[in-house]
Amino acid sequence: MKQKLQIVTAIVAILIGLTACQKTTKDQLIGTWHYTATTTIDGGIINIEGTDTNKEDGTYSGVANAICTFYTEIDGVNVQIKMGISMKESGEWTVNDKEIVSSPTSSGVKVTYMRYYDPSDGSFLGELTGRELLEASDVFVQDLNLMEASTERILMLQENKYVTESIDDDGRKITATYTRVR
């Protein structure tokens, strides 16, 4: 009888130890993460690479660079436009079950370059510089709604990596892969 009691006590102690070691989803996401993702806006493809820092107090900050590629027609000529974008954002984040909800409190976007190419052979046609680039940047930023809350569903979560899924402006799924930096 005494031996059975010791075994039960040992099992209970192990179970208590295991549950004490389990981290919440939010605790696992605290830290700095490097990520890559591809999304679309108005038919253009955007490849994003950035770093987010999720803090224990529920705030976050992030920086990212993106390359947006889209096709249009200018004066009857088909062109491919490649645009470099630099972004900064900060705000609050929470975890609801298996979703990360980010609510920005500040954001900034700058178009760093805008180049035009011939889509048939990839040859360079021209680029915007100076005032033209600033004006194009302002128009692009107005089209974005970066102060809108976003939700990412967690598909996979490991100690040093996680994968999320969300829906972009064109209704397509965005899969982002995050790798722990620290």
Residue positions per predicted region:
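Sec-dependent bacterial lipoprotein signal peptides
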Residues: 1-20
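Lipid interaction determinants
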Residues: 21-182
